[in-house]
């Protein structure tokens, strides 16, 4: 959740443009999509409901376009447990 917007988080999916766009179109209750890899690189996608470039900038000095952006979390630690990743990202979102 980011400022009342609902998002989907994936871990190590990679190449998210097509699956993220398809997911967001098929699930209009979701406003954004984030995939983070084991090195802390995140890709963000949206379908016009939230500015993910602004989100990426505020999260970790990232950037991009309104519907497609990215950033790198320098303090991210590789983990196996998805719940740890989810907690990490939600804590970051809560701070912006």
Model-found features: residue ranges?
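Gly/His-enriched, cation/cofactor- and phosphate-binding structural elements
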Residues: 1-96
């Amino acid at each position: 959740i980011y400022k009342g917007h609902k998002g989907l988080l994936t871990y190590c999916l990679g190449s998210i443009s097509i699956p993220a766009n398809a997911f967001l179109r098929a699930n209009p209750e979701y406003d954004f999509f984030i995939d983070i890899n084991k090195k802390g690189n995140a890709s963000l996608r949206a379908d016009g409901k939230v500015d993910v470039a602004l989100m990426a900038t505020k999260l970790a000095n990232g950037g991009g376009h309104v519907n497609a952006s990215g950033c790198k979390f320098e303090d991210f630690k590789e983990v196996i447990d998805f719940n740890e990743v989810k907690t990490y990202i939600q804590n970051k979102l809560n701070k912006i």
